[in-house]
Amino acid sequence: MTAVREQIFAAIEAALTDADFAAEIERMPSAGPTKFPALHIYDGGDIPAVGEAGTDRWEMSVEIEGTVEGGTGAEAHAAMSQLDTSVIETLFVEPVLGGLATEIEAGAIRPLVAERASKRRLGFTRTLIIHYATRRGSPQVID
């Protein structure tokens, strides 16, 4: 069986890929983007939340890094904002991540400027908090 957290990451990657608004989507990349707009997905870890008898509850942090390239500062900023909006609209649907999670929250967004890039590049990191539950002691079984 596959761990629920791996299923959640696969669901995020699949949803963003299927939405087809980014030229590059990669999970846990080892280098910067090469196609734009780009979305990179990072594992921010998880922490236990208050559970109940027979259930482990978790809050998982997922960092979505988006990057756009080109245009004026205003155009790049608008494209960056639209990329973030598209991520939220794609992932915040019911059932949450196909029923793998009980809730998804949008955390902080941190805009980024690639100051040494050969072309104008703006980006963001958006934290998502994903709540999910597993059978106590069995991280492969959704509860």
Model-derived features: where do they sit?
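A short, hydrophobic beta-strand-centered structural micro-motif
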Residues: 35-45
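Charged, amphipathic alpha-helical segments and their flanking helix caps
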Residues: 1-31, 44-143
